[in-house]
């Protein structure tokens, strides 16, 4: 005779039980005795004030089994349609090398390890993050790079506040060149307003070096041009300001470094180094700077030291800059890093090495050049005569029809304005894609887009990179799968993570996602969608966001939820700004 109910037989709580762990009645009694209470209800009585206690059941859906969750998430992912995206704007297609996907992204030795505050159990992670810093330092030409930030827009905002701390100018104004990604400008504006920073957004004619504490230039720009900003940067620095350059790490493989232009700070996103677009994140951003500004650098910084026996060892350096030590006087409230994504980006550069990165960068630039030549040969005008991976095409009488034709060919373009279309090429772009792009513009390539090849166009000769990059041994020795596999294993063997034992530390980072979550997040329907592709093609992602927001509103009894923060520190700042805005709205801004 069965002694189990149907719910017990279906094991509805099996998913959470296996993930969180079991707790039998004996364990529970012992725990309650240790803390001096009689029951869980008694514990709640002692800890949760009566006035705020919820007396009704939460209006949430019933729990699902692991197989049911899998089926539902696969169905939701199928509602998204990964496209051949040429939208760009800081998000590009990329290929995660299988050896890195299998041995880092899918390996709990890498994704369950804790923030490396204890260097004795973190040497592998610290080594990989030092590699990431070295990649960024080499590509930007600046001697110091941090171990990642949350995203490019946040990094730009952090660079602005860093410039204010470091600048000799007393001006509250900061210049941002108008051809910068719009989402970056938007985040900078949000950050600037409560700090009484006045953003001056415009072209070079709006630049007044004597009346600003710093300036930000994009290299390449959002619409694709490659400008030599060295004269503008020099003028800003002579006037006592700080110069920031937003850049693309793949572009820096071919272009003269930001340091060569005179930049004090360089920021950007490492997403295209092997990290899927993921409908906008998460991705690792970066920041690099000069020795003079090292102590103003936000985020974590891995440094080389020695252990008690005098052997080389790695550790987090200059931690007194960080919020967990310096609190309100910290260099930034954003203490979070994107360490796993930074590791992937660093290993991507290690896997390809300088030769492989140069091959990818040159291919991307050549595809953009071939498209530019094909369009110009058929009467189209380009907005710029320089480019790396992005071209802007004038279509005075039919931009919307070209966009629509592209969508019919499974292509997404950027509508810069009503008469201009942006096209961004990436590692995943093929000659077939190029051919279809030309078709969308009504250009017949006669099945041979190679006829438009022109290797020496797009990059000004004066801005061609001539110095070597990634000269360290690690970037020369891991270009075969078995070498990379062994290197990844050697690094992970130096670490302690949840695949070996519990870690007796507690913080906001100590959340171990079920393996299923990681697997579902890598489905193409979730991983390979651009954040700005048509809403009709990302209904699954929007459903997940809306459903999660609904659950959070019910859990918190709040009327609205903002889903944009990428980390706890982001959320804290967003919350404070929301409170501030509410007070201002009701006349209590002071």
Please report, for each region that a protein language model flagged, where it lies by residue.
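Gly-rich Lys/Arg/Thr-decorated short loops/hinges at beta-loop-alpha junctions or inter-strand turns
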Residues: 10, 107-119, 137-142, 168-172, ...
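Conserved PLP-enzyme active-site core in the AAT-like
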Residues: 154-315, 375, 392-396, 404, ...
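N-terminal entrance/gating region of PLP-dependent enzymes' catalytic architecture
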Residues: 26, 30, 45-131, 137, ...
């Amino acid at each position: 005779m069965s002694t189990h109910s149907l719910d017990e037989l279906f094991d509805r709580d099996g998913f959470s039980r296996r993930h969180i762990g079991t707790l039998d009645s004996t364990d529970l009694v012992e725990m309650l005795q240790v803390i001096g209470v009689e029951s869980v209800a008694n514990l709640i009585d002692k800890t949760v004030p009566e006035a705020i206690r919820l007396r009704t059941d939460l209006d949430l859906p019933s729990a699902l089994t692991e197989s049911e969750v899998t089926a539902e998430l696969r169905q939701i992912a199928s509602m998204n349609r990964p496209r051949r995206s040429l939208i760009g704007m800081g998000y590009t297609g990329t290929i995660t090398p299988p050896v890195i996907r299998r041995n880092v992204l899918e390996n709990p030795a890498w994704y369950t390890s804790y923030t490396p505050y204890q260097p004795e159990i973190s040497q592998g992670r610290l080594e990989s993050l030092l590699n990431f810093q070295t990649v960024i330092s080499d590509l930007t030409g600046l001697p110091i790079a941090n171990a990642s930030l949350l995203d490019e827009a946040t990094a730009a905002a952090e660079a602005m506040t860093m410039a204010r701390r470091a600048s000799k100018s007393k001006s509250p104004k900061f210049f941002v060149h108008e051809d910068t990604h719009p989402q970056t400008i938007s985040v900078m504006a949000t950050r600037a307003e409560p700090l009484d920073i006045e953003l001056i957004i415009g072209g070079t004619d709006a630049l007044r070096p004597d009346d600003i504490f710093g300036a930000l230039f994009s290299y390449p720009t959002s619409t694709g041009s490659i400008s030599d900003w060295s004269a503008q940067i020099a003028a800003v620095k002579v006037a006592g300001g700080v110069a920031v350059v937003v850049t693309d790490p793949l572009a820096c493989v071919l272009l003269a470094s930001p340091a060569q232009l005179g930049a004090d700070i360089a920021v950007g996103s490492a997403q295209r180094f092997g990290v899927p677009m993921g409908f906008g994140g998460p991705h690792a951003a970066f920041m690099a700077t000069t020795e003079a500004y090292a102590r103003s650098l936000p985020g974590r910084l891995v440094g080389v030291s020695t252990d008690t026996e005098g052997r080389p060892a790695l550790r987090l350096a200059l931690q007194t800059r960080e919020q967990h030590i310096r609190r309100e006087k910290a260099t930034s409230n954003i203490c979070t890093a994107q360490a796993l994504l930074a590791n992937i980006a660093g290993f991507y550069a290690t896997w390809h090495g300088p030769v492989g990165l140069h091959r990818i960068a040159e291919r991307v630039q050549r595809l953009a050049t071939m498209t530019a030549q094909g369009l110009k040969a058929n009467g189209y005008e380009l907005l710029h005569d320089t480019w790396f991976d992005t071209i802007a095409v004038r279509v005075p009488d039919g931009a919307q029809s070209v966009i629509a034709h592209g969508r019919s060919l499974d292509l997404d373009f950027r509508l810069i304005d009503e008469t201009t279309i942006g096209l961004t090429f990436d590692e995943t772009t093929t000659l077939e894609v190029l051919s279809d792009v030309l078709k969308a513009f009504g250009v017949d390539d006669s099945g041979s887009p190679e006829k438009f090849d022109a290797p020496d166009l797009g990059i000004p000769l004066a801005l061609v990179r001539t110095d070597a990059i990634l000269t360290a041994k690690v970037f020369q020795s891991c270009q075969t799968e078995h070498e990379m596999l062994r290197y990844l294993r050697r690094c992970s063997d130096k670490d302690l993570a949840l695949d070996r034992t519990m870690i007796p530390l507690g913080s906001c980072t100590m959340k171990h996602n079920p393996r299923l979550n990681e697997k579902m997040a890598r489905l193409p329907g979730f991983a390979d969608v651009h954040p700005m592709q048509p809403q009709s093609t990302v209904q699954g992602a929007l459903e997940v966001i809306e459903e999660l927001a609904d659950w959070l509103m019910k859990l918190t009894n709040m009327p609205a939820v903002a889903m944009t923060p990428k980390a706890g520190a982001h959320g804290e700042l967003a919350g404070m700004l929301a409170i501030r805005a509410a007070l201002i709205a009701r006349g209590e801004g002071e």
